[in-house]
Amino acid sequence: MSVINVPEVEVEMRPASPNARTLRATVVQASTVFYDTPATVDKAERLIAEGAAYGSQLLVFPEGFIGGYPRGSNFGAVVGNRSFKGREEFRKYYASAIDVPGPEVERIAAAAAKYKVHVIMGVIERAGFTLYCTALFFDSQGRFLGKHRKMMPTALERVIWGFGDGSTLPVYDTTIGRLGALICWENRMPLLRTALYAKDFGEIVRAKFDFDVVGHYARPDVLKLTVNDHPLNPVTFSSGTAALEKKDSENV
């Protein structure tokens, strides 16, 4: 697995079975070009090309990459009122979302086909007057396989995004294996994970740095970290047989 824009972090995933082939996946860590969807899609195409140059077969983009994750924005919303400035900001955000299917979807599909990679793309989907946080799936032949809409937006996300209804929990058979996705906090929801397990979702891949200690908006369970700075005696480990032999020799 490689991480674009962090060149020092590159780990190749190897299956447990010696007979299985190696899959190289790329996690894209990049920002949206806010309120400029064409520029964001241009950037996505460049990143897909860069991932393919690494030899990747699968590229996974961030939540809401096309359309943007508006971290820190409140869109002027308080209980009982919305400011004019906030309304204008939401108008721009709504205009930056994409229709699914639509021209932006076609461009990502074309890039997947051109570089022969599978892509999972985070987008803000516009459906009528509702926005959804959505993951789109593409295979290496450039086919748009389908989508997953985030079921339960977190906290203030519920002001700007609609709720998925459970009808978009796909797992797709592809040439590199079965692909599915959950978005952000959904990975902490046991029933959603169980729904994927029930569809024979072969393997769950989560980054080893998933534990976030810097205050991610969706980690209320992390209240504080306490560090014991007092020196402690070192702990050594040995086999049970060696420990017994040492004890017997001391008793002789």
Region roles according to the model:
Residues 1-252:
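Enzyme catalytic cores with a strong preference for nitrogen-chemistry domains
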